[in-house]
Swiss-Prot record:
Disruption phenotype: Both female and male gametocytes appear normal and fertilization proceeds normally. Meiosis is normal. However, ookinete maturation is delayed. In A.stephensi mosquito fed on mice infected with knockout parasites, the number of oocysts in the mosquito midgut is reduced. Residues 171-180, 377-394 have a biased composition (Polar residues). It comes from Plasmodium berghei (strain Anka). Residues 581-646 form a coiled coil. This is Ookinete maturation protein 1. Keywords: Coiled coil. The keyword Ribonucleoprotein does not apply. In the mosquito vector midgut, plays a role in ookinete development. Residues 141-168, 649-659 have a biased composition (Basic residues). It comes from the Eukaryota. Disulfide bonds: none annotated. The keyword Coiled coil applies. Residues 125-184, 340-405, 609-697 are annotated as: Disordered. The lineage of its organism: Eukaryota, Sar, Alveolata, Apicomplexa, Aconoidasida. One of its GO terms (biological process) is development of symbiont in host.
Length: 1031
């Protein structure tokens, strides 16, 4: 094919400045002279030289420019031949040693020229042994003959690179074959080069390496692909080159395939003489950057005057080439278009042929893509018209690039669609009808789905996964089929319950099932008939084992029964697949539902029809009965009231017309719609049948419902409070483990808390119950609203707080009482089985022993009193116990005290006063929490009375306050009325609870004593009052 010439791109370096105007005048004159020589020489000489070089596999050239110019070493690997010419300022000749690895004895002597222009010839692989005509060689020879005339001149010639392909090794350029006749150019396959540049500190020491390897990058990539290490800082004045890259395109398929194979297997892995470079570069980048850097680096070693002369010589030749080559490019573009149109037609034909063919390998598929890559190399040359004569840079039209991109995208889409069709046919079934063979591939990873059992898409994804043994797969299929059968049986049992009552539905079910069976039999007969028409068919089943090997199993289907048995087995396993063979192209696998599923659908439709009919009949019967009853009741009511009879409006019967229309259209109503209509009709009928109750009864029911709801809400609140108590006690127990045993925490200290705390002590009644500790509960019903947090212990302040009980809501008071009641109920059940209490540091047995010593010490006094008073005396032991508080009769009683002492103990006592063995400790030990609850209930009754008397005048209100104050004092001390005391009407005893009597046996007395098992301060009555007084 014809060669295409790339226009030269020239770029001016901004860092160089001219010396003076005198030098510029001299240089312009030299340019004019050289232009005249060039034009004359082109007209006279038309003959071009040609060289034929032997076919070479891999070419890699390493050129090392060293400070000493005499040393030049060219190394080649694997049948490589390199010829180069290097010269110095002197007129000495330089010979080149060309080494061939295959033939160590052969040395070739290329042509040696006396002139100073240096030329490097890069040799490429030539597969077809074709010869080409190089335009560059003719131009170089013209310049040589010019410079023979001017031997006295000391101009430094231009360093150039020419890329050639020649026929054989024997016709290497020498003195003998310079004047060989011209040969016509032939089709040549060119593979791209990858050029690597290694930048060193010294510009003269510059290494260049050229490897013929397959380049993945496009040839039109910009210069910015270079890494930072590859960018060259010092460039010449004009950044360009005169030589031209030759791009050859072919239409022959055989040549294209051979080039592709060689592109992948060119580089030798065991190259030792080459340097390893990490960065690659395209040919275009090398043409733009590589040679200019080399020229600039080599020229800097010479004088500055010679350096500038060579640059202007490059400028003159570039101007000529731009004018000549652009005209050539326009003619070449017309040829390229014609050639590409022919190529596209051939390409379409080839694609149609490959679609019909099957069994191609993946390597051949990839070859089509690589052919397209080579043919698309010429697309960048379509835009040559966009290059301007004097433009330093390449300007590409955007419209042309967008068009090419769209074409590429459309071509890729078509290719992907074609490949997908091939894969489906190859993976599922590869058939060749002419040979009458069927290839069916069965993979072990296939899993059945409910809708489509084969699952083509899932099969492709799971091919790369782990393989499953055939035995496991067979077991899974059996398990799956058994489950389906069980589910079907359950559904039938559930739905036959409604069908048993109706006789006519059974006949309908049988008819539908028979119809389904007939359809299935007809389909089977059709498939079997097609098989009979055809002759012997070989079914080859390809199974892939874990090792990757394939096993072929041939089955001759001369007899139809064998095929039938396979189909039956599949249907029993739940697959339900049928294979239908088409005469044209391939086997299509169609997944069908099982017989059982078809039966179920028929059953569902019939059962729904039966349910609707039942519902309609029941509605009719009920409506008729209710209408008759409602009419009779209306007549009775009118007779009792003496009113005239009113016409009774019958209800409209709905859903009859709608159901008929829906059934006509083929729509089946669902069961739950009919049930909803039933419920609505029943509710409406019940509302009519109910008699209107009396107003009084309704009001009572409403009140009872309201009370029940309020009780439920309160119970929920109580449960929440108790849950909070359990959580807080766990936290406190953790803290107290690390506390000192001597220091006791004040539980009632509420300075740092947002809620009020109260404690209730539940004391054990016998010594056997000492192991159970006391229980402490707290309540957060009332938030702290008082401004003064530190309240004193004076009695006046406590009395004032009692009057604030009127401002407390009644619901909150009732809630407290419910909490107390619930606590007591729990104690009766759980106190003996669980310890839901906090346990203090000091041991229980030690405390109990101290109490027993105190009691045994007083045993002598007890016996003295027993002798003094006989059993017949009116003051017997049963009457005169330790807890009798009458000072008139028992002045020497240890536990006798008056009202003031008890009052002081309750209100003005401190922790230091409660020492083990004191009378006040023992008295308060006997105090029971039931009295506290009674006090709270009494207080509630007082508050209710006060609210009722709020509307009375002020005088009555003040009196009620006085009496209320007195009552509160007595309630605090828990005193009885004076009238109840028979001994003295002016004196009120202290009726402390649980008065125990002494018996003759002291051990019985000790077992029945009420004791406090732990050294804990008992609760004051004032703290119980705080529940009421808190606000």
């Amino acid at each position: 094919m014809n060669r295409t010439h790339m226009p030269n791109n020239h770029k001016i370096h901004e860092g160089i400045n001219m010396k003076s105007s005198i030098n510029e005048v001299k240089k312009s004159k030299r340019i004019e002279k050289e232009l005249s020589y060039v034009t004359n020489s082109t007209k006279k000489k038309s003959k071009k030289k040609q060289t034929n070089i032997k076919k070479i596999g891999d070419v890699s050239v390493n050129i090392e420019n060293i400070n000493i110019p005499n040393n030049l070493n060219l190394y080649t690997d694997n049948e490589s031949v390199v010829s180069s010419k290097y010269k110095k300022k002197k007129k000495k000749k330089k010979k080149l040693n060309i080494y061939n690895n295959n033939d160590n004895s052969k040395y070739l002597k290329p042509q040696v020229v006396k002139k100073k222009n240096s030329k490097i010839i890069f040799l490429h692989h030539n597969e077809n042994n074709t010869s080409t005509h190089s335009g560059e060689s003719s131009k170089f020879q013209k310049l040589k003959k010019k410079k023979k005339i001017k031997k006295g001149t000391k101009k430094k010639s231009i360093n150039k690179i020419s890329i050639l392909k020649h026929k054989s090794h024997e016709s290497f350029p020498s003195t003998q074959n310079e004047n060989t006749p011209e040969l016509e150019p032939k089709q040549v396959n060119l593979s791209p080069l990858e050029i690597e540049i290694n930048k060193t500190n010294d510009i003269d020491k510059h290494g260049l390496e050229i490897n013929k390897t397959p380049s993945t990058q496009n040839f039109n990539d910009p210069i910015n692909n270079l890494d930072n290490n590859e960018k060259i800082k010092d460039r010449g004045l004009f950044h360009g080159i005169d030589n031209i890259y030759e791009n050859y395109i072919t239409n022959d398929k055989e040549n294209m395939q051979s080039v592709i194979k060689n592109r992948h297997y060119i580089i030798d892995k065991n190259e030792q003489n080459e340097q390893a470079y990490n960065n690659d570069m395209n040919i275009t980048n090398f043409i733009k950057n590589g040679n200019t850097n080399k020229n600039s680096n080599n020229d800097k070693s010479a004088n500055s005057n010679d350096y500038n002369k060579n640059l202007f010589c490059e400028l003159t030749e570039a101007i000529e080439n731009d004018g000549i080559e652009q005209t050539c490019n326009r003619n070449i573009n017309i040829r390229l278009k014609e050639e590409k149109e022919a190529e596209e037609e051939e390409r379409k034909k080839n694609e149609d042929e490959h679609i019909l063919e099957n069994g191609k390998s993946n390597n051949e598929d990839n070859s089509f893509d690589k052919k397209d890559d080579l043919t698309n190399l010429g697309k960048s040359f379509k835009n040559n018209e966009s290059f301007e004569l004097n433009s330093p840079q390449k300007n590409i039209r955007k419209g042309s690039l967008d068009g090419m991109r769209k074409k590429k995208i459309s071509e890729k889409k078509m290719k992907t669609k074609i490949k997908q069709k091939k894969k489906r046919q190859n993976n599922i079934n590869d058939t060749t009808i002419g040979k009458k063979k069927i290839y069916i591939k069965e993979n072990n990873n296939e899993r059945k789905s409910s809708g489509l059992i084969l699952g083509f898409k899932k099969m492709k994804k799971k091919l790369s996964g782990k393989r499953i043994d055939q035995k496991k797969e067979y077991k899974e299929k059996e398990i799956y089929s058994d489950k389906l059968k069980d589910v079907i049986k359950d559904k039938k049992k559930y739905k036959k319950k409604d069908i048993d009552d109706i006789s006519f539905t059974k006949d309908i079910v049988k008819e539908n099932v028979k119809g389904v069976d007939r359809d299935d039999d007809e389909k089977k007969r059709k498939t079997i008939g097609q098989d009979e028409e055809k002759e012997k068919i070989e079914i080859i089943i390809v199974k892939k084992n874990e090792t990757g090997t394939e096993e072929e199993i041939k089955v001759e289907t001369d007899e139809n029964p064998k095929v039938k048995t396979k189909e039956k087995c599949k249907i029993e396993n739940g697959e339900g697949c049928k294979i239908a063979i088409d005469e044209e192209n391939s086997v299509f696998v169609e997944a069908e539902n099982m017989k059982n599923e078809a039966k179920l659908e028929a059953d569902v439709i019939i059962i729904e029809d039966a349910e609707l009919r039942k519902d309609e009949e029941e509605d009719k019967s009920k409506n008729n009965e209710k209408d008759s009853k409602s009419e009779e009741r209306d007549i009775l009511e009118t007779q009792m009231a003496g009113k005239e009879e009113k016409p009774v409006l019958k209800k409209k019967k709905k859903n009859k017309g709608k159901q008929r229309n829906r059934e006509g259209k083929g729509v089946v109503e669902k069961g739950y719609d009919a049930k909803r209509e039933k419920k609505e009709n029943e509710e409406k009928n019940k509302a009519n049948t109910k008699m209107e109750p009396n107003d009084s009864i309704e009001q009572k029911d409403k009140l009872s419902n309201v009370q029940n709801m309020s009780n439920i809400v309160k119970n929920n609140k109580v449960n929440k409070i108790l849950e909070k108590y359990i959580i807080s006690k766990k936290e406190e127990n953790l803290k107290r483990k690390y506390m000192n045993t001597k220091k006791f925490m004040d539980i009632l200290d509420i300075s740092e808390k947002k809620f009020k705390i109260d404690t209730i002590n539940f004391f054990p009644h016998t010594i056997g119950q000492v192991c159970y500790s006391d229980i402490y509960f707290f309540f957060d019903t009332y938030e702290k609203e008082l401004k003064k947090s530190n309240t004193g212990k004076n009695t006046i302040k406590l009395m004032k707080k009692l009057f604030k009980c009127e401002y407390i809501e009644m619901n909150n008071m009732e809630l407290i009482l419910q909490i107390f009641d619930k606590i007591i109920d729990k104690l009766k059940k759980e106190l003996k089985t669980e310890s839901i209490v906090k346990i203090y540091d000091e041991e229980e047995h030690v405390i109990a022993s101290k109490i027993m010593k105190y009691k045994n010490g007083n045993y002598d006094k007890y016996m003295y009193n027993k002798k003094k008073y006989d059993s017949n005396n009116e003051y017997s032991i049963s009457e005169n116990n330790l807890f009798n508080q009458n000072p008139l009769h028992h002045q020497n009683n240890l536990f006798g005290c008056n009202r003031n002492k008890l009052y002081n103990i309750i209100f003005n006592s401190s922790q230091g006063e409660y020492i083990m063995g004191s009378h006040s400790f023992l008295i308060l030990q006997q105090w029971n929490d039931e009295y506290k609850l009674a006090m709270l209930r009494d207080k509630l009754e007082q508050i209710k009375k006060r609210k009722q008397n709020m509307n009375d005048p002020i005088a009555k209100y003040i009196k009620s306050l006085k009496y209320g104050f007195i009552d509160s004092l007595f309630s605090i001390c828990c005193l009885y009325d004076c009238k109840k005391n028979d001994n003295d009407a002016s004196y009120c005893d202290f009726p402390l609870p649980s008065q125990n009597t002494f018996y003759t046996n002291t051990q019985i007395h000790l077992d029945n004593m009420n004791l406090n098992s732990e050294r804990i301060l008992p609760m004051k009555i004032t703290k119980a009052v705080q529940i009421l007084a808190s606000s």
